[in-house]
């Protein structure tokens, strides 16, 4: 990593606007970088210099203190680097802007490059962006503010991106994903992106807020608000009136344009005062055998004062989209389904304005009002214990770092808490670790992260603790968290636990203990990756948060036992997270051929996981679940004497006998549930099963022949008559039954042609 020559050390900064204490590996206003936070001098090169430094040491956080930073050209955020500023919520009562980016760039009709270009496992957090050259009297076009590059030029731009806590005061274009063009490669051939996280993005955009296409694995979008009010409120920046801004956006702007995006959920999206609220457009990916189009679900979509609410041009064949517990109010049309196939399903959704097109289904069942906000988790004592600088750890993947890490953990515990910091690197650990009360074991990553094919980086622990065990479920976890303790911003992998390395049987893995156990109340596991983990996370305490857990789990992803108020958000299990890794090229002697990105290795993983892997299991617990996705697993949910609410979860390519839910004496609510293949639900014992909004492709006990391939069907097994089922036995065709909901009154297709002319 070059620590001896280049490492200047990390430090805690005085800023409580982030979800946890900010540990900065570089501060742009420091002398060696030289950014001006008064907004006078050009800070572009200073910020680039800080990013380059942090990228050189393997990844980490570049901090921009509160102030104004003038930027005059595009900035690339490198792999495993996060830009963090001081976030000021624009819905607050003051006109404070926190870290304000003055985007003093030249107007251009070109959409790219973006002001900030994000590479894999990078992030931009806590910035407010203002374009000083933009006026309503002379509206000028600018490229997108954020560019999610995708793999058009390099695999390094393909996977995992975060834009969070960001305000756009007067952007012309907001965020684009997979719009980057490589002139030597056809559009749609290799420019897909994966794992885009957009959270808490607010602002006024004049042309388009989100323009996202060609997503090949799941991300999620939450708390996105586009409204004229944000520019109008910026009176210190010479803002126009809200009526003037609204007059422009309502005649020219589209808040969300979404194309061939797979499986992603959308929570709490609010659009006010635009020409079009949400436009589902044709995708770009070249995939002739099985063309990809939009499929996903919205929960609490709120569209107000628009000309067009939801307009759909293309949907995935046989599938469609879900809109649940929402409001769509528009002058000319609330919903337009112009897709040649696929359906729009509205559940508990209030509309105002005409509907046009076929296959729009309305279900009036009152869906549950579910919690979608991440609970605030404990902030620890602001004392830093750097295992490299203070304890002599050598993170090269070969030196044993166990003693240094545990000594730092013990010191933090004795002193009443603190942050044990593992800078970017590879830490070999050979014994179990205990994280005491109020202590955070922290890697260098401040956002969701995963290994990128072609380049590994960030903080990774190599676990050499367990071999095969018959008592793996009850053995002591590799990392045990106390009360108010956390694991944050790192990845843990098992070099010896992959299918191709163990014995002669290519489908055998070591049964190991849980990687992490939250044993104390108010614990958290956030922005963590687990590669080739047999058992992932166990929760045996109250008020625990698990968020952005990305990995490959052979047996169990998350098990919640005798716990109350556990929150689980954005958990993914997919063998690609293990096989699309740069570790095999960096450590050729430590990792076997299963870590290579090869189709045969990948499907050996899937052959195992599709009959073994269980995602979320709860026993005697209450759990709120959001955005769980798996590919080739055996079971999504299991509940025994528990209460589970699950919102926006999906399962792709499950085997025929796979289960979405096994429920015994439990109360379960599923909202916007997507699945491909498998049986749906087994419910036994006194309890309830409430299902609002569901898409299913291929009946579980039938072969995936063309007779059923494009049919949206359901296969529900309910053993207890007390179980309450909404949406069972559906089949999308005319006439539909009462449980699915009634088709909307249909206008002739010629009316759609006329109405769509207004979108041009």
Give each language-model segment a name:
Residues 2-3, 156, 191, 323, ...:
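Intrinsically disordered, low-complexity regions enriched for glutamine and histidine
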Residues 44, 157, 192, 260, ...:
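Conserved structured core elements
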Residues 65, 72, 78, 84-86, ...:
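Feature marks extracellular polysaccharide-active and adherence modules
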């Amino acid at each position: 990593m070059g620590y001896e020559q280049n490492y200047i050390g990390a430090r805690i900064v005085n800023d409580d606007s982030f979800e946890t204490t900010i540990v900065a590996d570089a501060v742009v206003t420091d002398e060696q970088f030289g950014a001006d936070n008064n907004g006078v001098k050009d800070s572009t090169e200073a910020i680039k210099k800080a990013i380059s430094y942090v990228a050189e040491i393997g990844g980490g956080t570049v901090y921009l203190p509160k102030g104004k930073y003038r930027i005059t050209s595009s900035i690339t955020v490198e792999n495993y680097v996060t830009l963090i500023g001081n976030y000021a919520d624009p819905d607050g009562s003051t006109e404070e802007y926190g870290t304000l980016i003055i985007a003093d760039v030249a107007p251009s009709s070109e959409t790219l490059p973006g002001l900030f270009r994000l590479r894999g496992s990078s992030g931009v957090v806590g910035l407010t962006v203002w374009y000083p050259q933009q006026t309503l009297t002379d509206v000028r076009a600018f490229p997108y503010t954020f560019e999610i590059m995708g793999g058009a030029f390099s695999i390094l731009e393909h996977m995992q991106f975060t834009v969070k806590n960001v305000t756009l005061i007067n952007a012309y274009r907001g965020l684009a994903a997979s719009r980057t063009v490589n002139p030597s490669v056809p559009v749609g051939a290799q420019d897909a992106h994966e794992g885009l996280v957009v959270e808490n993005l607010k602002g006024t955009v004049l042309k388009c807020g989100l323009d996202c296409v060609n997503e090949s694995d799941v991300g999620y979008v939450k708390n996105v608000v586009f409204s004229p009010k944000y520019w109008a409120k910026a009176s210190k920046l010479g803002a126009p009136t809200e009526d003037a801004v609204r007059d422009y956006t309502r005649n020219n702007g589209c808040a969300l344009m979404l194309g061939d995006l797979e499986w992603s959920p959308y929570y709490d999206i609010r659009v006010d005062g635009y020409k079009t609220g949400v436009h589902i457009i044709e995708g770009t990916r070249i995939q002739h055998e099985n063309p990809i189009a939009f499929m996903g679900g919205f929960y609490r979509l709120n569209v107000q004062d628009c000309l067009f609410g939801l307009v759909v041009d293309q949907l995935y064949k046989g599938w469609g989209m879900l809109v649940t517990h929402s409001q769509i109010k528009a002058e000319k049309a609330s919903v337009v389904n112009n897709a040649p196939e696929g359906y729009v399903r509205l559940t508990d959704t209030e509309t105002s304005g005409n509907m046009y097109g076929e296959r729009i289904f309305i279900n009036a069942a009152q869906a549950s009002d579910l919690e979608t906000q991440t609970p605030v988790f404990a902030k620890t004592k602001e004392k830093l214990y750097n295992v490299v600088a203070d304890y002599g750890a050598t993170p090269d993947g070969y030196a044993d770092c166990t003693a240094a890490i545990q000594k730092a953990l013990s010191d933090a515990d004795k002193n009443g808490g603190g942050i044990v910091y593992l800078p970017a690197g590879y830490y070999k650990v050979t014994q179990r670790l205990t994280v005491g009360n109020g202590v955070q074991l922290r890697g260098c990553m401040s956002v969701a992260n995963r290994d990128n094919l072609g380049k590994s980086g960030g903080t990774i622990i190599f676990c050499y603790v367990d071999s095969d065990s018959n008592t793996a479920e009850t053995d002591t976890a590799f990392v045990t968290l106390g009360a108010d303790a956390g694991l944050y911003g790192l990845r843990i992998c098992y070099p010896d636990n992959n299918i191709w390395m163990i014995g002669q049987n290519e489908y055998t893995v070591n049964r190991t203990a849980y990687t992490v156990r939250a044993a104390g109340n108010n614990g958290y596991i956030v922005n963590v990756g687990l590669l080739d983990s047999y058992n992932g996370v166990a929760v045996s305490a109250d008020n625990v948060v698990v968020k952005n857990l990305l990995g490959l789990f052979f047996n169990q992803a998350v098990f919640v036992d005798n716990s109350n108020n556990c929150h689980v958000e954005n958990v993914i299990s997919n063998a690609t997270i293990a096989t699309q890794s740069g570790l095999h090229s960096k450590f050729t002697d430590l990792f076997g051929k299963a870590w290579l990105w090869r189709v045969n290795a990948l499907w050996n993983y899937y052959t195992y996981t599709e009959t073994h892997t269980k995602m979320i299991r709860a026993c005697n617990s209450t759990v709120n679940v959001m955005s769980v996705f798996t590919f080739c697993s055996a079971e999504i949910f299991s509940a025994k004497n528990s209460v589970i609410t699950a919102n926006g979860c999906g399962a792709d390519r499950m085997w025929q006998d796979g289960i979405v839910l096994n429920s015994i004496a439990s109360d379960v609510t599923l909202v916007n549930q997507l699945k491909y293949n498998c049986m749906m639900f087994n419910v036994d014992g006194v309890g309830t099963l409430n299902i609002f909004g569901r898409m299913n492709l291929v009946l579980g006990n039938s072969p995936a022949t063309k007779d059923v391939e494009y049919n949206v069907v359901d296969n529900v097994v309910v053993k207890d008559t007390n179980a309450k089922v909404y949406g069972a036995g559906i089949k999308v065709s005319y006439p539909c039954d009462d449980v699915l909901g009634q088709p909307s009154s249909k206008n002739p297709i010629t009316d759609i042609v006329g109405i769509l002319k207004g979108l041009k």
